[in-house]
């Protein structure tokens, strides 16, 4: 199984095909388990597959929402112009969600502490941001964060990042998550003065929902019909 890619676009195409070919039927998805891979060029965040039609404008809005630190979906609506239905389904009675990762890394000043740690102790193994918090499981009824943690390490004088996820939907989750995590990596790089290294991404469960299977073939069938 290939585990190193130039960028997220290469990884998306590879795992889309692999999920079709080797994925296990799991609930309403096709899934692969304990998938880990490296992106050598984390700044290359574009997903170019024509059948995916990735919305970079939305990914940028989600990143700005993370930077705001607000758990309120209304803040995303102000930035993007509307609140996608998936966030409406996940919000609590106060219109808040747990999966604004910026809100999570600002709690306890985690991001600031990671930056300080990397600057003061480049060999640290503790530069970790925790997203999922087992002590808050009673709050996760509608919205359980898909990401466990993000860890940074200095190797060969470059900043490397590892993202560990309990669950990752390849179609929506990975495409938007990799954009935001890459932006986070660039921000930490700028604040610490280290060059960007590699981005390692691990998902215990990497999946496609069944309604996203065959989207590449559907596009080809439409092209053949109108040829």
Kindly give the residue locations of the regions a language model identified:
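Terminal, non-catalytic protein-protein interaction segments that mediate quaternary/complex assembly
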Residues: 1-227
